[in-house]
Structures are given as structure tokens and as C-alpha cells.
């Protein structure tokens, strides 16, 4: 067939209704591309938010507003708060940590004093057993934990101590099907001296504990500050990550183009790992309309 004949045929098809055939071909191509994305492991992002960033917004109002723009979860709640989100048809993707006291009267379970000290283990084991049991009763499956600060302790000893205590907790977590998730935090800006401040350290702790019920919370904001290389790190350690948090760098504010991270690209990378959990917005809004900033964050992460 000559080029002239081929061109004339295309023009004839368009004039006589062939345009619909061309459109059908385009749709078919789109469907094929979507199928390729699905085959590569792409899954929808499940959206959550950390309640503490919206202290001046009631939990009821946060659920009502958030559900309208795609939030499925409000997290870092204690068990007695969770029925509120469930009433709205939402969930709590990550239950907050228990805080308790040792026999010596030291408050433990928070960021600074936790699993890297042997003397904290007895109190923490009792508190986490209760928290895990309550989490299971609510139909949930993820509880946050922390390493604690170094306070003069070297990283190797701290890891051994964390592993010793958390190994004792794993039979309880495994029995109830609840994952204990340790957060990676930066020790440069926000949490000076925090021990679990590198992904590789957390991943080695996961290997040492050796249970599918112990994982990491990869906080994108915190790890950008500590080590950068976010997408490559997510790809490398994807099997040891059970949860993600967001935040703009620098400042921990909105995740829009006022900060340096490319969140749509990061979300696409998370999708390609086949991750089926939640990504929680954990930035502190600077704008007067806090919920508008939250809505924007959800939209940015919907890829």
C-alpha cells in the first residue's frame, strides 16, 4: 500500500466514523498501560493522618472532614479513642504507644525512654501486652514503639537490649496478629540522641528479632534529614517497613512545592513495592486553614 493510499484511508476512516475506532484504540492502550502498572505491583495508597498534628481540631471533626476528602484512618490514638473513628467507618492504622512507670518510678514507653534499656523491659512488656490485647479486640493490627535515646549507650549495645526485650514480646504479638512497629526518627533536628535514627540500624534490629510481627515505621521526613536517598532506601528495605509517615523538609510543614521532597514520586515508588498499608500525613500545617492543608497533602499523595 502506498503512503498516499494509507493517508487517504486514515482520512476516510475519520470522516466516516473511524474516529470512534481510533478512540477505542486509545482506550485500549490506556487499559493496557493500567494493566502493566498493576502487574508491576502498583496499588492504591491508603490515607491516614496523625491526630497530634491537629490538636485544635476535635477527633469528631477531623473524622467528618477527613472522610470527605479521602482519609481512611486517624492514627496515634489510644484504644479508648478508637471507637470514635470506627463510628465514622474509619480505622486507626497505627495505635499509639502505652506509657507506664518502672518500679523505680521512671516513665517509660515514650520516645526518649523505651526498649534500649534492660531496666525498662519489665514495665514495657506488661504495658505492651495490654496494648496489643486491646488493639486486637478493636480489630486492629499495628502498634507503635520506640528505641529510646542513647544517653551514653553505644548503638550495638542498644540494639542488643532492644532485641532482648522485644523478642519476649513477639509471642504475644504473633498470637494476636498485631505488628509492633518501631519508628525511625531524626536525631539532628527534632529528637536529639534518639537511637533508632538510621534505616540500616532498624533493619538489623528486625533481623535480630526475627519475627514478621516486628517492623519499621519509615518516616520520610525524618529519614530525609538523616540520610536522604529516600526512594532507594524504600526499595532496599521494603520488606521491613510496615508503615510510612510524611512531612515537608525542611520545617515539617506542608508537603507541597514549598519543600524539597517529591512526594508523588515517593508515593509511586511505595506503590511499586506492592505495599498495602497506610501512608499517614504527619506534617504540622502552617496555614490558617489546617484541614485545607491536610486535604492538599492527601491529594498530593494520591497517585
Locate the predicted segments by residue:
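Active-site acidic/histidine proton-transfer and metal-coordination neighborhood
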Residues: 16-29, 112-215, 225
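N-terminal small/glycine-rich loop or linker at the start of catalytic domains
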Residues: 40-50, 98-114, 149-150
Amino acid at each position: 500500500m502506498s503512503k498516499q493510499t494509507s493517508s487517504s484511508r486514515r482520512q476516510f476512516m475519520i470522516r466516516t466514523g473511524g474516529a470512534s475506532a481510533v478512540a477505542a484504540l486509545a482506550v485500549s492502550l490506556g487499559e493496557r498501560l493500567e494493566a502493566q502498572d498493576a502487574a508491576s505491583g502498583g496499588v492504591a495508597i491508603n490515607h491516614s493522618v496523625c491526630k497530634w498534628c491537629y490538636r485544635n481540631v476535635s477527633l469528631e471533626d477531623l473524622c467528618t472532614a477527613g472522610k470527605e476528602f479521602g482519609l481512611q484512618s486517624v492514627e496515634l490514638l489510644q484504644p479508648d479513642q478508637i471507637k470514635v473513628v470506627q463510628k465514622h467507618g474509619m480505622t486507626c492504622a497505627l495505635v499509639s504507644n502505652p506509657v507506664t512507670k518502672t518500679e523505680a518510678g521512671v516513665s517509660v514507653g515514650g520516645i526518649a525512654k523505651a526498649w534500649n534499656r534492660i531496666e525498662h523491659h519489665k514495665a514495657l512488656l506488661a504495658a505492651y501486652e495490654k496494648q496489643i490485647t486491646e488493639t486486637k479486640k478493636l480489630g486492629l493490627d499495628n502498634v507503635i514503639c520506640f528505641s529510646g535515646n542513647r544517653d551514653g549507650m553505644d548503638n550495638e549495645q542498644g540494639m542488643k537490649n532492644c532485641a532482648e526485650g522485644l523478642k519476649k514480646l513477639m509471642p504475644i504479638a504473633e498470637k494476636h496478629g498485631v505488628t509492633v512497629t518501631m519508628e525511625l526518627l531524626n536525631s539532628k533536628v527534632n529528637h536529639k540522641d534518639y537511637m533508632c535514627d538510621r534505616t540500616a540500624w532498624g533493619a538489623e534490629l528486625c533481623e535480630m528479632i526475627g519475627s514478621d510481627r516486628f517492623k519499621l515505621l519509615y518516616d520520610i521526613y525524618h529519614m530525609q534529614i538523616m540520610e536522604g536517598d529516600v526512594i532507594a532506601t524504600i526499595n532496599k528495605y521494603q520488606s521491613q517497613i510496615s508503615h510510612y509517615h510524611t512531612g515537608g523538609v525542611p520545617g515539617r510543614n506542608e508537603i507541597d512545592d514549598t519543600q524539597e521532597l517529591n512526594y508523588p514520586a515517593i508515593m509511586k515508588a511505595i506503590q511499586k513495592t506492592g505495599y498495602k498499608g497506610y501512608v499517614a500525613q504527619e506534617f504540622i500545617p502552617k496555614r490558617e486553614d489546617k484541614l485545607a492543608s491536610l486535604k492538599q497533602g492527601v491529594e498530593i499523595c494520591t497517585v
